[in-house]
Amino acid sequence: MTYRSRAQLDAGLADVVHSPLDQGRLALIVRRPASGVREVLAEAVLDPTLGLVGDNWSVRPSSQTPDRSPHPDMQLNVMNARVAALVAGPPTPLGDKTAGDRAVGVYAVGNGPMADHLPIDRRTLAGDQLYLDLDLSEANLPAGTRLYLGSAIIEVTAQPHTGCGKFSARYGVDALRFVNSTSGRRLRLRGLNARVIVGGTVRVGDVVAKVG
């Protein structure tokens, strides 16, 4: 697997910064039922207590809470869909997995027997649940901003969402430096954290709009 170079990533930034400021779209939903497993969904239920229903956030210990309980401000990991597509590149055939792919055991659709015969949608390697075609920058969505998403409402939290070693293993060192750069953090290229305020159903293609 050949990772995107920094030059390719920088060239793709022009498209990213033209993401809608409002009235965006939910492009991809990914549930993580267990560590290293991804389920690409057409729709999902968001719950104020559980986050994305069926996702392992509600049972996964957090190193950022005193009692290691799930962090309430990290219920939802949200990434810009254009950034995800940029760093991921095209789907990878199963015969061309990188070590990072094998380590996480990611599937393109679901987690059933047929998944073994499907190419890997490398966007899902990021590990986020919601991928939005929306400007996620700090300037456009400061902490506390609420968004209508399907019949749910979510709120952007102040908890940082930055790239880590796993991100580097899956997308390359250049991608990690790209999202963690000064401008990358300002634009939230790695994404943002959010919590569910009003529960509801969300579907791929749903409009995402600022509340108020």
Predicted stretch roles:
Residues 1-212:
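Metal-cofactor-dependent catalytic cores
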